[in-house]
Amino acid sequence: ALAFMNKGFRASDVLEQCRKLEAADISYNFFYLTGISGAGRGEIGAKASAELFNQLHPQIIESSMLTIYKTSELYQEIQRGNWKEEGEIEKLAELKALIENLTIDTRIVTDGASNLIQVRGHLPADKEKLVGYLEHLIETADEAALREYRVNLRHL
């Protein structure tokens, strides 16, 4: 996902630079964009990210959900058939997979307008509660109602 989204760095770069921050006793946070891996790949991306995050010590992992606007490059990629957006329930499942696979001591939050829900907790202590909450939402959510929120989100 990092290469496709033209981020200009690899997971190994993140690991190297964050270890330098830790060696200098500088705290840092991570930002996780739920949905960036695309349809059918969210849980793979979540597990790969958790594997990287588990090697480090971020203070906070903040997650937001991808919202695609018609003026974005990603929208053009969708129009060309090069990328497909995750559904809203799939985004919730991706967030659940991220939390399930994190083993480090950190805070996790979902703040910002792009999030359908607010999740806040301290891992690993709140993992079971957060996963249970997400499982309930995944089982009971209405994709069309969730999508309605996303398409009416004018700005972030």
Where is each model-derived feature located?
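Conserved non-cysteine loop/helix-boundary elements of the Radical SAM core domain that shape
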Residues: 1-25, 35-56, 76-90
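Short, catalytically relevant binding-site loops at active-site mouths
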Residues: 34-39, 67-71
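Auxiliary Fe-S-binding modules of radical SAM enzymes
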Residues: 51-156
